[in-house]
């Protein structure tokens, strides 16, 4: 019979594959467009935000004239002070900033406490407890 007889089986299966045709790369000429160069760039901008709903209060302004940039910005810090930063940048001195901090609300002037003179009450003697033993 067929029981116990060796059976020949292939070692693995593989699907045939197609090879893609490889073409040599083609050189494509690109046109180089030179960026416009401004030898003395200039700009100026600024904004101011005062939002009563969110409490957001900040502003900024900046100008550039050639290689010199000057500007400032301010905002309200979480502790309630206004921080203002004034800055300048140029090729000779680099970037420099000065920071100012100012309270938003003027400090309230508190008057010195009034000292009232009060007379001490008359002194009374405390009652003495007496114990009797029988």
From Swiss-Prot:
Component of the cuticle of the larva of Tenebrio molitor. Keywords: Cuticle, Repeat. GO terms for cellular component: extracellular matrix; extracellular space. The tetrapeptide (A-A-P-[AV]) repeats found throughout the protein are also present in many proteins constituting the protective envelope of other species. This is Larval cuticle protein A3A. Sequence repeats lie at residues 23-26, 111-114. It comes from Tenebrio molitor (Yellow mealworm beetle). GO terms for molecular function: structural constituent of cuticle. Residues 40-106 form the Chitin-binding type R&R domain. InterPro entries: CHIT_BIND_RR_consensus (IPR031311), Insect_cuticle (IPR000618), Insect_Cuticle_Struc_Prot (IPR051217). Residues 38-80 are annotated as: Disordered.
